[in-house]
Amino acid sequence: MPKVSVIIPAYNRAHLIGRAIRSVLNQTYQDFELIVVDDGSTDNTEEVVRSFNDNKVIYIKHERNKGAPAARNTGIRAARGEYVAFQDSDDEWLPEKLGKQIKAFKTASTEVGLVYTGFWRIEGDKRTFVPSPNITPKEGAIHDALLKGNFVGTPNTLVKKECFEKAGMFDEKLPMLEDWELWIRISKCYCFKYIDEALAISYYNPGSLNKPRSLMEAQTLKLMLDKHFEDIKRNRGLLASYYRRIGHLLCLNGQIAQGRGYLKKAVMTYPIDVKSFLLALISLFGQRSYNKAIQGYKRIIRCC
């Protein structure tokens, strides 16, 4: 049995997936299987995967497109390894990524269920190291820190398979951010360990959040708030930040009345939060005024 199961979900990524697969096969640590879950692709993704002709590579295909969370869950169910790693079809690993994570697990407490590394975020000509040095704590019992935002990532993680048995798998009902939500659940049961070194590269398309995606994020945050409300409400400032983010995204997406309602909730929950107050005030002047004000005050967007 392989020690590690690496899972790559793919949907119409024939032009990119070769790079991701090569970066996995070129690891210095070689005790792994690579499970590629083709999520109903209509291009030649299968042809590219099979061209590697490597007995480590296992190809599974969904008859129809089900989304990345479902594809990853299919991979988890098929995994034979003690540990599970995730790679995205358009990203890549540095050669020592798996080896250093396995070494970290060997020296870690049995309470550690996930080891993650730093990674480079490439967006156009801009390269950023993630997670930010300002984020603390990065390891140990980090459940409260993760409730505030996702600094863990996905292609840079190595997870004990037992974590999925205890905390569950990816939530297929979430429109996006399903990795963050899973890490929140796992962090309630296990400690995390961090390697302060960039061992993966994630590529992002440059550009701002578009309207359909911003609405998806608002819907996702609503679901996450419902799911983890008991933990989030213990910190009134944190609860207000969820309300504020949801409200702001809804307002940006043309749902000014509903968005204003969430912004009012944010103000009522944590009255000393200036950001919530300013956004709620701007929303009172209607959709056009809100859009113009936000375009004119980029700082507000960055704070939300």
Write out the residue ranges for each language-model feature.
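Short aromatic/hydrophobic "clamp" motif used to bind/position activated sugar donors
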Residues: 84
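Conserved nucleotide-sugar donor-binding catalytic segment
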Residues: 77, 134-224, 243, 250, ...
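N-proximal low-complexity "stem/linker" segments adjacent to membrane-targeting elements
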Residues: 1-25
